[in-house]
UniProtKB/Swiss-Prot annotation:
It is found in: Cytoplasm. GO terms for biological process: translational termination. The keyword Cytoplasm applies. CDD domains: RRF. The lineage of its organism: Bacteria, Pseudomonadati, Bdellovibrionota, Bdellovibrionia, Bdellovibrionales. It comes from the Bacteria. This is Ribosome-recycling factor. Residues 135-156 are annotated as: Disordered. GO terms for molecular function: ribosomal large subunit binding. InterPro entries: Ribosome_recyc_fac, Ribosome_recyc_fac_dom, RRF_sf. Coiled coil: none annotated. The keyword Cytoplasm applies. Its main location: cytoplasm. It comes from Bdellovibrio bacteriovorus (strain ATCC 15356 / DSM 50701 / NCIMB 9529 / HD100).
Length: 186
């Protein structure tokens, strides 16, 4: 394996960590209605658990509510049950044609808890990025030991890997900071 491959693998792992962080943070709710909040809801559609977005149209008429219009009125009850079973803490209002969801206001205490949760998720992402760096540096040391690359090339590769690591940690911090700001903003 060449140094370029080691760098590429490390960068791919870090990229994957950043994407994973973004997905994880989508699940942490802010005080505003965002369609991504409902991504985890699975509806029993003719015996098959299907994502809510595939069985209904989801819109946000205002910042604090959802309007869910199923493609088939027959599955309205199933959608309602799926929402109740989810851990969103929202009570669906079924009028026979559509379901309305009100996003409850977050208390100050809940906002702080969510901000702590964001920090914890971000720290896990930082650790994953550092582990990718460590794995890459171990590969470089192995290449040096096997005399596949010179010591100077190894040092340069480690410096490049460190630079990529620093960039990804900055990106992780930026994503987490944006989410925290969204949570703490009333």
């Amino acid at each position: 394996m060449a140094i370029a491959d080691v760098k590429k693998n490390a960068q791919a792992k870090m990229e994957k960590t950043l994407n994973s962080l973004s997905e994880e943070l989508k699940k942490v709710r802010t005080g505003r209605a965002q369609v991504s909040m409902l991504d985890g809801i699975r509806v029993n559609y003719y015996g098959t658990p299907s994502p809510l977005s595939q069985v209904a149209s989801i819109s946000t008429p205002d910042a604090k509510s959802f309007l869910i219009a199923p493609w088939e009125v027959a599955i309205l009850k199933d959608i309602e049950q799926a929402i109740i079973k989810s851990e969103l803490g929202m009570a669906p209002m079924n009028d026979g044609k559509v379901i309305r969801l009100k996003v409850p206001d977050l208390t100050e205490e809940r906002r702080k808890d969510l901000a702590k949760q964001v920090k914890k998720i971000a720290e896990e992402a930082r650790v994953a990025v550092r582990m990718a760096r460590r794995d890459a540096n171990d590969e470089v040391k192995k290449l040096q030991k096997d005399k596949a690359v010179s010591e100077d090339e190894g040092k340069k590769a480690e410096a490049d890997i460190q630079k990529v690591t620093d960039d990804f940690i900055k990106k992780v911090d930026q994503v987490a900071e944006e989410k925290e700001k969204a949570i703490l903003t009333i």
